[in-house]
Amino acid sequence: MIKLTVDLMIEINRGMLEKWIEKHPDKFEGVGSDRDKLADILTEVEKQDNVIGKAAYLLARIAWDQPFSGGNKRTAVICADIVLRNEGFKLYIENKEDEEYLRKLLFEVQEERVEINPTTIAKLVLYVSKRITRI
């Protein structure tokens, strides 16, 4: 089991951004993080009732809070998958259509500036519940 911590989330983001920068040096997004936001996100994730809710909430909160200077949505997907794997599941994004729909949902969340819309969270819960498989 891999414990998802603030430090691990930062490490995931940095590693992911380094690979991105290698492939797209002209699109450098910067590397930085807000440890307080990340700690708050993890605290709130733990309050969720089940692993699907935790994964969906993690996806939403990272996309909404933008705790990293770049790669927030990509980092959110990796972190949500870790939470699922710790419970014996994995996120299975089968095709480009699935990927694009998740991206659309995360952009919806990102645009919600006052608070996360419960309807969008419900869509994320449904998305995750239909795209997990036992490992």
Predicted segments, located by residue:
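FIC/Doc superfamily catalytic core
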Residues: 1-135
